[in-house]
Amino acid sequence: MSDERLAERPADEADEQRPPVRPLDSVDRDILRLLRADGRASVRSVADQVHVSRANAYARINRLLEDGVIRGFSARIDQERAGHGTSAYITLKIVQDSWRSVRERLRELPGAAHMALVGGDFDVLLLVHTKDNRSLRDLVLTRIQAIPEVLSTRTLLVFEETDLDPEP
């Protein structure tokens, strides 16, 4: 979003502070699709592609930011070229009702890229990127397994990653 300053939203607002969900129309969905493909697209470019005025596109993008639909803008990174030759999904079983404290500890980990509380055979799915296998081993054995609420872990090495393109 290079040509205007858009609303900034704290990365981690509490759920009770979030505005109610507003329905998205086809123009909103088109804007999201375009920004997902190119988060650096200018408001003017977005407006032209969805056939609305620049002011309308600006207002819509700002609303999507304020409502928390757009959580931010980021770059897609080739982890290997960035010096992270090893990626892994780590599954964790944790003590019941400890998600919030475990989440805060996992956020501090170097290379943690994504985490989710899930249902099934394990409780947490964590994606990490590390320099090499030794760094991954150290991360799992000395950092993650040292968290008192973590009961067990299982590490799944990633052999190849593919970013999915936005829907047409």
Where are these regions (language model features)?
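A compositional/biophysical signature of low hydrophobicity enriched in polar/charged and small residues
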Residues: 1-168
